[in-house]
Amino acid sequence: TGAITPVAKVNPVNIGGVVVSNATLHNEEEIIRKDIRIGDVVKIERAGDVIPHVLSVDLKKRVENYKKFVFPKKCPSCGSKIIKDYNKNTKKFDAVQRCSSEGYKCEKIAIEKIKHFVSKDALNIDGLGKKVVEKFWEKKLIRFPQDIFKLDYNKIENLEGWGSQSTSNLNYSINKSKDIS
């Protein structure tokens, strides 16, 4: 989607048996509303027992010179302008800011699109999960969804963690995905 989601880097803390070192800040409006500043002591919870997010700031522990977070104007991945979509129904701009890059020009957007393309919600290709997509991207084996159907299996077989059997299994899964019923 190209959404730019700010994340708080926090000292590791155990929440419900899980060590948390990152917490979502949701969007710029939430940061402003909660007056979250760089260096603040914050209270974190795991929303729905899953995603850690900043609940509040301990203002008693705030140091006077803590700086306000300045939301970037350009995508940290590709440098394109960051925009807010206008919602015609509400007649307001959405809270979520997005990279304005189109197609597959932004690396982060391209990788996420490919991950979705091969996911259980789309082609459901066994053996081609998120980490594999990232590895294939890093090795320049894929840049677009259609590249999945033109993979160089000789190069894949020579990658660390891959061999003839895993490569053969991937080839089978990709060919099987062509027969969508």
Q: What is each residue range found by the language model?
A:
Residues 1-181:
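RNA/tRNA-interacting regions in translation and RNA-turnover enzymes
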